[in-house]
């Protein structure tokens, strides 16, 4: 389980990544997390891995957040459903990157649909999910230092060859998550009739 000392690291990583992705999409102005080049090697590694993920899976992943039809009342449930589906086959670094990209996409969709207060909430859900459901796996897999070694500072090319299987399984999981989101939406629609 996460130690209290890891909470600021996790929180800072989530805030930096979400801020970075929102700025890439032109949603955030001014100084804040994700502004400019990342000084922390972990933040640099997560940004690079997230960019690579989006490049590889743009077609599969591009509209996932929009397809979930998130509202303030359904956002946390949808976030948890997709996150649980993503890690159903067990965690790996590729799925962890997908989790960060999904969280940032959900934040961008919230801003796009004028639900900005959800951005902070989604970040809190990401931190809580990481610290309650993934902390043991992260620790047993070498911690964030191992992630940084795999994805950071020039290691991305080498890591790409090592993790090809991780990315392929992420595509399957994301397709299932989209289908799950669609089924939940259709089920809720018919239940309201």
UniProtKB/Swiss-Prot annotation:
Keywords in UniProt for this one? Answer: Acetylation, Apoptosis, Membrane, Mitochondrion
- Any single GO BP term: release of cytochrome c from mitochondria
Q: Name one Pfam family in it.
A: Bcl-2
Q: Which InterPro entries match?
A: Apop_reg_BclW (IPR013280), Bcl-2-like_sf (IPR036834), Bcl-2_BH1-3 (IPR046371), Bcl-2_fam (IPR026298), Bcl2-like (IPR002475), Bcl2_BH1_motif_CS (IPR020717), Bcl2_BH2_motif_CS (IPR020726), Bcl2_BH4 (IPR003093)
Modified positions (N-acetylalanine) are 2
> Could you state a single Gene Ontology molecular function term?
channel activity
Q: Report motif location: BH1.
A: 85-104
Q: Where in this protein would one find the motif BH2, according to its record?
A: 136-151
Source domain of life is Eukaryota
Instruction: Tell me which GO cellular component terms the UniProt record holds.
Output: mitochondrial outer membrane
Where is the protein localized?
Mitochondrion membrane
Question: What is the topology of this protein in the membrane according to its UniProt annotation?
Answer: Peripheral membrane protein
Biological function: Promotes cell survival. Blocks dexamethasone-induced apoptosis. Mediates survival of postmitotic Sertoli cells by suppressing death-promoting activity of BAX.
**Family assignment?**
Belongs to the Bcl-2 family.
**What information about domains appears in the record's comments?**
The BH4 motif seems to be involved in the anti-apoptotic function.
Q: What is the protein name stated in its UniProt record?
A: Bcl-2-like protein 2
Gene encoding the protein: BCL2L2
